[in-house]
């Protein structure tokens, strides 16, 4: 049967109903079903002709392969979708009026705008019908529909035959699942729904009469899983309903007559006094104008909005975002506008409200248990809390040839702070998510920065009723996923057996799988998983009952195949190949270190909480007396260790002094505990720390200890602590840095490691075969300190003297290794680590040897410089007694650290980002540091400068404006050295940003009086065009030192070439090289260049290859070349010149190059 006319009638009826939201809903539904492209969807929204819009929609529906499915889907999702309006008296939890919601608006001049107007639709319809349509072309696409009737037996047989087709079953299952919401909100649609589903799923025909007794006062039962999203269409199956499915309806006692044949058109079923609206059964062609759908007398209440909209309510009611087939416009209303829902005159009866069904009891019970579990967890870590703001991070291409992505290091002033806690950040990020797509959010930071506290705070926040965009939050510490083999199911990932178990039965798991967009999965300490490599490209698991590996489950989530649409939150240390797994992350954040002010605040709170507030100032004085520990206190875990030792020293009442190294700090903390330990307890704990670190773990079973006494001692002394919420008897080291220290203790005193293998654990020159991955990244510094520092006050204070004597042999091995190192071959990060190791040794010979080998130019471009790095680098530069130039761009160095390095007398010049440097100047000027400000200005250089982004041009403009403000008289002697001494400037912004940013650069070019090389190509087509050349030419009189001008690939035509030729004589005495390679210069431009060529007395090389001038232009250039004996090369090969002409010109003058 040809359905075009029937579909067209339905669409025309819908478009004439004056409900623009239904029109938009229909178009959005077609877009979601991929029946429309986004471009065609946008065009239909702007279609001004209603009849044309109806024809285009009908043609789109007709082009679908299965016409019946198209028609049924359209009826379910568009025609019978209830319009939801919010009452004007509705208020949210904050007692804010929500009567005004988002005004989606309509495209100007479109049919949607016409529907929103106040014009009478019937008047417009007749007016349009009377218009002259003679000029329009009418195309008959289909014949009249077949008017034959079909009875129920034939229809059932047809459905049974189609069930043999897999695609047909899946498509009908799609319809059956997606239209649940459409039919469940009103009794009208509830009846139609059950009739439809019962008829599809019945294995036998209905009897002629069915008697359904209903008890008086019985409430209608609601279907389960009201919010349930349909799974992927490839996995949907049509589940036949039982013959008793009509029991879901509250029908009057009596008989229901089943007709085996239905009349053509609309058939109305109504029951007086039942409170039910009329039921319409459609068959055949829908009348277009003379038949009108009866309106419902039911009052449809507002649906609670989803959590990402204002006014969200209980999570047990479906939100607007959860309705699978309800487009967004159908759930919003215009400002100060309500839709008329008054009953028609032919309908009577009281209004009835519909109560939305809740979740299944098992799902609701599981959610409450999960919330109670998170509420019971302790939220505050040991010690005080100091609020820090997350910093947005990004990945960039590495500097090596592997093309791997790594975490970028922004300049200090370029940092983007994410205000608010992680819960607020998740709220903002979720607002930007694409529907149905998995969202990956990563929170990175060094050990001890508080990442796990951030993660636990999110789960606790959700348990307390916030983060309403999620129905379930699963907080999973990754150490609980350490089970070998292919024995993992999805429920094992969400609720690991080693955690406090929660009963997740199949019903709960099925609900979670069908509602992944309401799930937040938190994987804490992701670096502890061995299965983190290759997650984006490796094989992934499935939702089948068969178990798979943990890597397979994680790969399925990262590849957006399992729980597609969920939110995945990772916390990890930024190391190893983690960046490869995060290359497609939606958002990456970093937990920053303490600032100096925050570190002091932490110390004050620590002493206040411990009841010794009077020792605050004394403790701060002790810390300020040790600059290295002061710089390390930017790490919260080290700051806590400093507070603990300071408190112990002040309680002793003796002359207190903190140690000068990080190794000394931990030796002082663990020394008293080691003296009161069982025999060999510290060595045993050190061995466990090392073995766990080699396996990337930080937790262990209590049975790993040799005795209960050793375990009790470790827990009592605060070295180990119970893990949260685990069912097994597990312990974890109190901090990652403590585990590193204990691992270094094991290396320093054991005999199991050969001497020749010891240097690899300094991680300075990794081996090519079986390299040491340095997961315990604090081991190298502690190992150097334990081996080299005096035995009595270091290693001897922790272990027995006989055991400590082993360190003497290891000291000789490491001394020989350190003195053979060639510092010039080390990368910036390993050079800093070497400086730290040399400082921890406290051996003057090793420290001076390393310092004197430092090269004169030190580049830390792209390497993160922490406060401890700045301190040891400054000490090394002072010890070296030579001049240095530093490149500190993209290091993230703090302004105070930058000032400390710049103020060193041995630093003669430095490079840093323009924004960071100018921020330092402003800070020094405000502080009155005139001498340091002068040094910072004189040592700063930007030679050579390459502009790769608009921000680079803006910063350069700010630098020039700063100079003009300080030197309004334009005295060259008072110019900033960075501007006065700039000799090479490259401009590489590309063809899009180049034309936009070049006018700013041209405006400030005259300030660079010493500029010798101006490269406007730099392997990037900037395409500044003729306008750019015109602006550039105006600056030539001030660029008296310019020797090289590269204007290649800039889309210059004859107009620009003529402008350039007019201005070139201003550079006659300085310009040596001119390149106009690959532009659009024709004969006229070539002629103008030929005319000015004899005036360029200093020009040596000119390149005009790959332009568009012909033999005439080439001959003019060759003739002019005869008058220029100073020119050495004229490159002018171009495909528009005949090869014979070029050869002839080259024979006349050998200086003409055709290569």
From Swiss-Prot:
Induction: By IFNG and LPS. By STAT1 in the upper small intestine. InterPro entries: Leu-rich_rpt (IPR001611), LRR_dom_sf (IPR032675), MHC_II_transact (IPR008095), NACHT_NTPase (IPR007111), P-loop_NTPase (IPR027417). GTP binds at residues 445-452. It is an enzyme of class 2 (transferase). Residues 439-749 form the NACHT domain. One of its GO terms (cellular component) is PML body. Residues 171-210 are annotated as: Required for acetyltransferase activity. Residues 217-237, 297-357 are annotated as: Disordered. It comes from the Eukaryota. Keywords: Activator, Acyltransferase, ATP-binding, GTP-binding, Kinase, Leucine-rich repeat, Nucleotide-binding, Nucleus, Phosphoprotein, Repeat, Transcription, Transcription regulation, Transferase. It is found in: Nucleus; Nucleus, PML body. One of its GO terms (molecular function) is ATP binding. CDD domains: LRR_RI (cd00116). Autophosphorylated, affecting interaction with TAF7. One of its GO terms (biological process) is cellular response to exogenous dsRNA. Residues 224-233 have a biased composition (Basic and acidic residues). Its EC number is 2.3.1.-, 2.7.11.1. It catalyses: L-seryl-[protein] + ATP = O-phospho-L-seryl-[protein] + ADP + H(+); L-threonyl-[protein] + ATP = O-phospho-L-threonyl-[protein] + ADP + H(+). Transmembrane segments: none annotated. Interacts with ZXDA and ZXDC. Interacts with PML (isoform PML-2). Interacts with TAF7; interaction inhibits CIITA acetyltransferase activity, thereby repressing transcription. Essential for transcriptional activity of the HLA class II promoter; activation is via the proximal promoter. Does not bind DNA. May act in a coactivator-like fashion through protein-protein interactions by contacting factors binding to the proximal MHC class II promoter, to elements of the transcription machinery, or both. Alternatively it may activate HLA class II transcription by modifying proteins that bind to the MHC class II promoter. The acetyltransferase domain is necessary for activation of both class I and class II transcription. The GTP-binding motif doesn't confer GTPase activity but promotes nuclear localization. This is MHC class II transactivator. It comes from Mus musculus. The lineage of its organism: Eukaryota, Metazoa, Chordata, Craniata, Vertebrata. The gene is Ciita.
